[in-house]
Amino acid sequence: MYSDSEDESSELSTVLSMFEEKEFTRQYTVLKTLSQHGTTEVRLCSHHLTGVTVAVKALKYQRWWEPKVSEVEIMKMLSHPNIVSLLQVIETEQNIYLIMEVAQGTQLHNRVQEARCLKEDEARSIFVQLLSAIGYCHGEGVVHRDLKPDNVIVDEHGNVKIVDFGLGARFMPGQKLERLCGAFQFIPPEIFLGLPYDGPKVDIWALGVLLYYMVTGIFPFVGSTLSEISKEVLQGRYEIPYNLSKDLRSMIGLLLATNARQRPTAQDLLSHPWLQEGEKTITFHSNGDTSFPDPDIMAAMKNIGFHVQDIRESLKHRKFDETMATYNLLRAEACQDDGNYVQTKLMNPGMPPFPSVTDSGAFSLPPRRRASEPSFKVLVSSTEEHQLRQTGGTNAPFPPKKTPTMGRSQKQKRAMTAPCICLLRNTYIDTEDSSFCTSSQAEKTSSDPEKSETSTSCPLTPRGWRKWKKRIVACIQTLCCCTLPQKKCPRSVHPQK
């Protein structure tokens, strides 16, 4: 009893001390625990220089335990959009820290349980990404060997990330592996038989179990004990619901072939009819090359003390040191900013957009006019002039004007506060005699064949001209502060003499 509690306290102190080493705390701050399995723990941390959150997996460094070292080497090899990215490796005498990107989203297990089962289109989209990542791994000589719903993260947009290569292994073409590993429901027949196995064919079997689970909500081989599951797997007994499409049933049958030699490779599956129905294309390519670093990120890192040559060397040789981590974190932030750039610029609350000509809210009540202000001038912005010219809303020619921009790029348009477009006091616009026509009015007049010819150019009728003439005279009188003599009206009643 005493020894058990002593072991638990020793294990807890070991985990706590793993994240207190100076080499680690100098660069990162621990925020919270994400998961813990024995002496292996994953915590959410913050990078000091950039403030970006990362996932840190701490491993107890033991030279005799090769799988831990193998996981580090495997993560260094891989670079794929559907595989969680390794950013940095910190090695001390006692621990190994794997600094990785945070996989946003939820586990595939939770996603399936919430929906009970996924529709074929959604399952196909997820499966295509899984196949792309696994096909890439096999091309790099890496097998995962622990594919399961808990190790697949799906975000709100349906993007997939495969995590946890702790049971992964490297292999050569034709090489057989012997280590027994994996979740019971995902173990293929050859491993249950204790035979040396082909690593990629084990991943293909696991993909079949995952696909079956996504579209049905249950596992194909179930049992309360390992022996019961083993019996079902070796006999290859499972039911495929008839409500699934014929091509999907065919795909599941190929993936769950009990004979490993009959299972297709990831490359073979590319031409399967069920995958041809989807919109996503399958590629086994890696992430973008960093041989040509971004000059803006290089300049930013130089300002905080990094040397340009050190940055180039770190990226070229993939050292996974502090320099490479800082560059990749800054690049990830820049990509997110670029994705939201247009939206944030267009939705700047401090810079309201130009009001539309047909928007009644743009025409507010006119201010009180002073005697020195003319009343026959209507102000419109350059953007409104351009819109009116396109819609045929005005016939008056406007000189070309340059649109103000922000920064050096002509694509980065700067929003301007639009002037209030209003009609001044004692003036109004009549659609019958005005030269200021909106697009909706032009459409209305063009639909009438009898009036289309005259309404398109909006000519001034004699009656309208007399109105404008009186207004212009009144404005000139006000500006010049002069009055014209008025005729006295004859009185109808005269005084008697």
Swiss-Prot record:
Keyword ATP-binding applies: yes
Catalysed transformations (reactions): L-seryl-[protein] + ATP = O-phospho-L-seryl-[protein] + ADP + H(+); L-threonyl-[protein] + ATP = O-phospho-L-threonyl-[protein] + ADP + H(+)
An example Gene Ontology molecular-function term: protein serine kinase activity
Sequence ranges assigned to domain UBA in this UniProt record: 292-332
InterPro entries membership: Kinase-like_dom_sf, Prot_kinase_dom, Ser/Thr_kinase_AS
SMART domains noted in UniProt: S_TKc
Purpose: May play a role in sperm motility, especially in the regulation of flagellar function.
Protein name per UniProt: Sperm motility kinase Z
Species of provenance: Mus musculus (Mouse)
